[in-house]
C-alpha cells in the first residue's frame, strides 16, 4: 500500500502540473499594444485576454465618461469597440461571445445607454448577460466595467 500512494501522488502531480502551468504561455496571453495600457497591465499584473483551449477570457473593459460628456452611449461605444479589437486579436468576434458580465455604478441610469449600444454589436442568438450594481470603479471616471467570455472561431 505504501508504494501505491506515492506512485499515485507522483502520477497525479505529473498529469495536472503541466496542464495548469501551461495555460498562460506566450501566444495564449494577449497584452495591449498601446504603450500606456501595456504599462498598466504590466504594473498591475493582468492581460487584455487569455486564450485557454477554445475559450477566450477578456479582462474587464471600463467604459469611462470623458470630461464634458453627457451622452453615456459615447463611453459604451468606446468600450465595445475596444472589446471588439481584443476579440479580433484573439481570433474571434462579437458573434462568438457566450457571456457578458457588466458591473455598473448606477444600473438604473446606465441600462438604457448600454442596451442601445449593445444592440449594435450583439446580434441574436444572444449570449448570457448578468448586470451587477457596484459602488465604484477604477478609474474614477468609470461608469461600467464589461467582462466577456467568447469562443474561438472554428
What are these regions (language model features)?
Residues 3-11, 17-98, 104-154:
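N-terminal presequence-like segments and the immediate start of the first folded domain
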Amino acid at each position: 500500500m505504501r508504494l501505491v500512494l506515492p506512485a499515485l501522488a507522483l502520477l497525479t502531480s505529473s498529469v495536472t502540473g503541466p496542464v495548469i502551468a501551461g495555460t498562460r504561455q506566450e501566444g495564449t496571453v494577449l497584452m495591449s499594444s498601446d504603450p500606456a495600457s501595456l504599462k498598466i497591465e504590466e504594473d498591475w499584473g493582468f492581460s487584455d485576454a487569455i486564450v485557454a483551449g477554445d475559450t477566450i477570457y477578456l479582462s474587464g473593459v471600463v467604459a469611462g465618461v470623458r470630461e464634458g460628456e453627457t451622452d453615456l452611449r459615447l463611453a459604451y461605444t468606446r468600450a465595445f469597440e475596444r472589446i471588439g479589437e481584443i476579440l479580433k486579436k484573439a481570433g474571434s468576434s462579437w458573434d462568438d461571445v457566450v457571456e457578458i458580465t457588466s458591473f455598473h455604478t448606477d444600473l438604473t441610469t446606465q441600462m438604457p445607454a448600454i442596451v442601445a449600444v449593445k444592440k449594435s454589436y450583439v446580434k441574436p442568438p444572444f449570449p448570457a448577460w448578468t448586470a451587477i450594481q457596484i459602488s465604484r470603479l477604477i478609474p474614477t471616471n468609470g461608469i461600467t466595467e464589461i467582462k466577456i467570455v467568447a469562443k474561438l472561431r472554428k
